[in-house]
Every structure is written in structure tokens, then in C-alpha cells.
A protein has these predicted regions:
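Surface-exposed, glycine-biased beta-strand/turn segments
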Residues: 10-113, 142, 194-195
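Short strand-coil-strand connectors
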Residues: 51, 90, 118-120, 167
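Histidine-centered divalent metal-coordination motifs
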Residues: 82, 128, 159-163
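Short histidine-centered loop motifs in beta-beta connectors
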Residues: 95-96, 105, 120-143
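Short aromatic-centered micro-motifs
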Residues: 96, 117, 164
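Short, surface-exposed secondary-structure boundary micro-motifs
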Residues: 107, 145, 150-151
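Short aromatic-glycine-enriched beta-strand elements
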Residues: 110-116, 158-160
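Acidic, glycine-rich catalytic/binding loops that coordinate metals and/or anionic ligands
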Residues: 135, 142, 163-195
């Protein structure tokens, strides 16, 4: 958690020896001391920029083609729960959303080629990849490419299927997308206030 505080102003102080007459204050002696180190505003800007860069969407552009929840299954036509979000994609790099670790890389009939990342109590899986770019155990930073979108596994066409779990329980990935959006908006607003 980052906090930002204003640095107190410093004033020039002159020690008087016993018996000396106190000099009259001048405008120069009353002025705040000039900062010689890094300016607090520059430090604040760096903090907000670092915070902005601490999160990323999994693709450069986000267009949800199938949301989380119940839907008509594209293979059976029956109502079925969709445990992730499908994003429109065409041969794009899949990016880590936050700092984390690659905990699983695999391939199966349903998810096709996939990679799973752990971000604290969250795990995020990116499925139907044409290629996985990260190995198990790799530490990733936000915006690190972990795969390339594709249409492997049980898929009707190229897209990115994103699933998310919190403490092992399936949750709607839009929770993370909303967090990323609010974090980036907060940072942009704070930076605009510093200009």
C-alpha cells in the first residue's frame, strides 16, 4: 500500500550567540529552503506510474464475446454454466495481469493449450492458446507475454478464454478486470493532479 505525504517546508535558521543582537528578518531569511534532492512531486509521479504499471489487461484490447455465467452451449445448444470469460482475439500475445508465478502449463481436450498463473490468493488460467510462452515456475511481471491466442481444445474459433479462482473457488474474471480499470483510472487522475 502506497501513501503519499507532503514534505514539510524547511526554513533557514541562524543560531545566536549570547549577547548578540537579534537581526531583523529579511524576505530571503523567511523564504523556504530550496530543495536540493529529488522533488516530492517527482517522487509522487514515480509512485503513481509504478502503481499504474503494476496491473495489465490480458490483451491489448478487451472485447468480451461470451460473459461469465449461464449461456447456451455452442456445441450442445443447451443451457450450461460458462466458468470464464471469452475475449475476442486473433494471434495476439496474452499478457500477465499482475506479478505472479506460472503454476501450471498443459493441454487437454477442453481447454486446449493453457497456462495458469498465481497472483497471491488468485489463480488465472488462459486457455485455447496456440502457443504457451512461459514455463512452469517462471516469475512474471504485469505485461509479460505468457502465450499466444489460438483455438485449441473445445473451441468454436480463435479467442481467449480466461478463468479465475480466489482461494480455489471459481469467480467471475471481471472482478480482476474491474480492479485493473479502477486502479488505472485512479493513477491517471492522481497524475493529472500533479501536472
Amino acid at each position: 500500500f502506497n501513501t503519499i505525504a507532503k514534505t514539510p517546508e524547511r526554513y533557514k535558521v541562524e543560531a545566536l550567540q549570547e549577547g548578540m543582537k537579534k537581526p531583523e528578518p529579511t524576505p530571503e531569511s523567511m523564504a523556504p529552503a530550496q530543495e536540493t534532492s529529488t522533488k516530492p512531486a517527482d517522487e509522487s509521479k514515480k509512485l503513481w506510474i509504478d502503481r499504474y504499471l503494476s496491473v495489465s489487461y490480458p490483451l491489448q484490447r478487451i472485447r468480451i464475446t461470451s460473459p461469465y455465467g449461464y449461456r447456451k452451449d455452442p456445441f450442445t445448444g443447451k443451457r450450461k454454466f460458462h466458468g470464464g470469460i471469452d475475449l475476442h482475439a486473433r494471434g495476439e500475445q496474452v499478457l500477465a495481469m499482475m506479478e505472479g508465478v506460472v503454476v501450471k502449463v498443459g493441454q487437454d481436450k477442453t481447454s486446449g493449450k493453457y497456462v495458469t498463473l498465481r497472483h497471491g490468493n488468485y489463480t488465472v488460467s488462459y486457455c485455447h492458446l496456440s502457443r504457451v510462452l512461459a514455463a512452469k515456475g517462471t516469475v512474471v511481471r504485469p505485461r509479460d507475454a505468457v502465450g499466444i491466442t489460438g483455438s485449441t481444445g473445445r473451441s468454436t474459433g480463435e479467442h481467449l478464454h480466461v478463468t479465475c479462482k480466489l482461494n480455489g473457488k471459481n469467480i467471475n474474471p471481471s472482478v480482476l478486470f474491474d480492479y485493473i480499470k479502477s486502479m488505472q483510472q485512479e493513477c491517471v487522475s492522481a497524475l493529472a493532479g500533479l501536472l
